[in-house]
UniProtKB/Swiss-Prot annotation:
It holds the Pfam family His_Phos_1. This is Uncharacterized protein At3g52155, chloroplastic. Its EC number is 3.1.3.-. InterPro entries: His_Pase_superF_clade-1, His_PPase_superfam. Belongs to the SixA phosphatase family. The keyword Chloroplast applies.
Length: 218
């Protein structure tokens, strides 16, 4: 069982641990990297599940469902918490589903720093999240494609079950992400590709979990 220590507000620092409970596809490994601890750069990854969506219009496709009023408020709260923790992304990679777009819109309206990030909407984030054990490797590939060495913090916005699986596989902890919950992960490398290669599955440090309220489930 993980030992949790509460930090204000609504942030929990979580020790890293290894587990074999996640049944997922292996991440691509690169054995040629040789990072020096003195020069290796911190790479911070935010895995954020979209905020609560509305089911009022049952004629809409799942892809097109908007946020509920609760979801809009929760997204604004999480944006403020991430800002207060100093976890503002320079690059945002998001599913193109309406509820993820609107989650980002609410975050940008609350905190100007989210407006400054470079944003790419990735259609495959919507579909990959439904496939068993595929999300972590897909995130690695997309992040490696869009990142540059000067970017230290990236936020990926998407859906369950894939986002929970990816957070669990990368950190080695058993992570549950409710709507608008975020896992904060850290690794080191002179590039994002190197950080993934050196850390491997289970090697990303789980720095904490963020939620719009004080209910955190690990």
């Amino acid at each position: 069982m993980l030992s949790l220590q509460c930090l204000p507000p609504f942030f929990i620092s979580v020790p890293n641990r290894s587990t074999n409970s996640c049944s997922t596809a292996p991440l691509r490994a690169v054995s040629d990297f040789a990072a020096s601890p003195s020069t290796s750069i911190s790479r911070r990854l935010i895995l954020l599940r979209h905020a609560h969506s509305s089911w009022d219009d049952l004629s809409l496709r799942d892809h097109d469902r908007p946020l509920s009023k609760t979801g809009e408020a929760d997204a604004a709260k999480v944006a403020q918490i991430l800002s207060s923790l100093g976890w503002l992304p320079q690059l945002i990679l998001s599913s193109d589903a309406t509820r993820t777009r609107e989650t980002l819109k609410s975050m940008q309206a609350q905190v100007d720093g989210f407006m400054e990030a470079n944003v790419h909407f990735i259609p495959s984030f919507y579909s990959i999240a439904a496939m068993d054990g595929q999300t972590a490797e897909h995130l690695q590939n997309i992040i490696s494609k869009y990142s540059t060495p000067d970017i230290s913090t990236i936020m990926c916005m998407g859906h369950n079950k894939g986002w929970e699986e990816a957070a669990s596989m990368l950190s080695g902890a058993s992570i549950k992400l409710k709507t608008c919950n975020a896992a904060l992960l850290q690794a080191f490398g002179n590039s994002w590709e190197e950080a993934f290669a050196l850390s491997g599955p289970g090697g990303w440090k789980l720095e904490g979990l963020v939620a719009p309220d004080s209910s955190i489930f690990v």
